């Protein structure tokens, strides 16, 4: 079996590619990074380290790479004979994959295939499906659509900043979760150990977004506000830890209301998340976790979405509000979005910036709360 994976970065190698290799797929990584691709082709393997006290070493075999800048014809040919296509490139890169994926799928012999976007965004595979459809004629899309599933997925594994002699080596936390929705598949689901298949992904997407991502953002933005350097330092601060717990209690109430999750099971999930944040071997910098604040303060994102939905239910998102306000003050010179955010504040003021970034009207109570308490 062969999987084509777009994105040979840390998540691609340390999570998706590693699981696919262990499931007996030959993994063909596609990336623009010539150094990584050349190294993959030289070594045909790489090492994944577990970021904990055991520091377990796993060698991932049966891998190679293609440079999408210089080897696009080969990329299309590989898609034509693949059993699975996956991505981990970042949501903003997905539009650029539509043309090669569409053209590669057109060359196939009619065997069913799944294209799974493993991105930190809701409905990423559906987005990729729309981009791919737009890149093809109606007749071409009809041919592709008959045998190609674009099942949505949610992925969760913290990959800390890396510093290894071998640029292919990657450290990852022990915990991971990869959940794939079955209802939009064509043909049988791929057999991959460690993957959970569900009929409806929405509850699992929001559980992760409103817990893992919300909590991570709270710790990062509140930690930055206090001048702390790492997630470990920030979560060790009693005030920040308590405020983050309060925020996750707020989102827990929302998730239990919307999806009937077991409150006890969700409490266990939250404790697992806190254990991950406290892992000294992950020790990510708050500046890195907090980057791209404009995206992370979006209407359907980790802080604003649960806060506005709680207000709709008549509940006050007090702790979430603290995280949102801290995010609007986030500024790191080498992060383009945080620089843009502070520029907007200086030029047009906080209220107009909040309206623009969150997509909420100025009269919305959440906008007034963000502006009023600053």
Swiss-Prot record:
Signal peptide: none
Reactions accelerated catalytically: D-mannitol 1-phosphate + NAD(+) = beta-D-fructose 6-phosphate + NADH + H(+)
UniProt EC number: 1.1.1.17
Alphabetical list of InterPro entries matching this protein: 6-PGluconate_DH-like_C_sf, 6PGD_dom2, Mannitol_1_phos_5_DH, Mannitol_DH, Mannitol_DH_C, Mannitol_DH_N, NAD(P)-bd_dom_sf
Record flagged with keyword Zinc: no
Keywords tagged on the record: NAD, Oxidoreductase
GO biological process: mannitol catabolic process
Transmembrane spans: none
Positions contributing to NAD(+) binding: 3-14
GO molecular function annotations of the record: mannitol-1-phosphate 5-dehydrogenase activity
SUPFAM superfamilies (alphabetical): 6-phosphogluconate dehydrogenase C-terminal domain-like, NAD(P)-binding Rossmann-fold domains
One GO location term (cellular component): cytosol
Family according to the record: Belongs to the mannitol dehydrogenase family.
Name recorded for this polypeptide: Mannitol-1-phosphate 5-dehydrogenase
Organism the protein comes from: Halalkalibacterium halodurans (strain ATCC BAA-125 / DSM 18197 / FERM 7344 / JCM 9153 / C-125)
GN (gene name): mtlD
């Amino acid at each position: 079996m062969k999987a084509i994976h777009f994105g040979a970065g840390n998540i691609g190698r340390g999570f998706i590619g590693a699981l696919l290799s262990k499931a007996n797929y030959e993994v063909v990584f596609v990336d623009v990074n010539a150094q990584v691709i050349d190294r993959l082709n030289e070594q045909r393997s790489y090492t994944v380290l577990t970021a904990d006290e055991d520091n377990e070493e796993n060698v991932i075999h049966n891998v190679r790479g293609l440079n999408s800048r210089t080897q696009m014809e080969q990329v299309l040919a590989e898609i034509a004979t693949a059993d699975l296509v996956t991505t981990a490139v970042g949501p903003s890169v997905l539009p650029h994959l539509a043309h090669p994926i569409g053209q590669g799928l057109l060359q196939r012999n009619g065997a069913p295939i799944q294209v799974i976007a493993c991105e930190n965004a809701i409905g990423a595979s559906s987005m990729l499906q729309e981009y791919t459809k737009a890149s093809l004629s109606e007749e071409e899309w009809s041919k592709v659509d008959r045998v190609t599933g674009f099942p949505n997925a949610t992925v969760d594994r913290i990959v800390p900043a890396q510093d290894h002699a071998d640029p292919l080596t990657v450290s990852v936390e022990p915990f991971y979760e990869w959940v794939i929705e079955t209802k939009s598949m064509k043909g049988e689901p791929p057999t991959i150990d460690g993957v959970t298949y569900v009929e409806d992904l929405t509850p699992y997407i929001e559980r992760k977004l409103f817990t893992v991502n919300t909590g991570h953002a709270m710790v990062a933005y509140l930690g930055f506000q206090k001048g702390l350097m790492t997630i470990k330092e920030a979560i060790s601060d009693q005030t920040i830890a308590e405020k983050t717990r309060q925020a996750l209690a707020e989102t827990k109430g929302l998730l239990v209301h919307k999806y009937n999750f077991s409150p006890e099971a969700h409490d266990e999930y939250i404790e697992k998340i806190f254990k991950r944040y406290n892992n000294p071997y992950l020790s990510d910098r708050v500046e890195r976790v907090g980057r791209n604040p404009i995206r992370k303060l979006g209407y359907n994102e980790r802080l604003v979405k649960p806060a506005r939905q709680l207000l709709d239910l008549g509940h006050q998102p007090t702790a979430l509000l603290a995280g949102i306000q801290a995010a609007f003050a986030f500024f790191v010179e080498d992060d383009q979005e945080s620089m843009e955010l502070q520029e907007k504040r200086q030029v047009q003021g906080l209220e107009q910036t909040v309206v623009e970034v969150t997509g909420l009207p100025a009269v919305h109570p959440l906008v007034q709360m963000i502006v009023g308490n600053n």
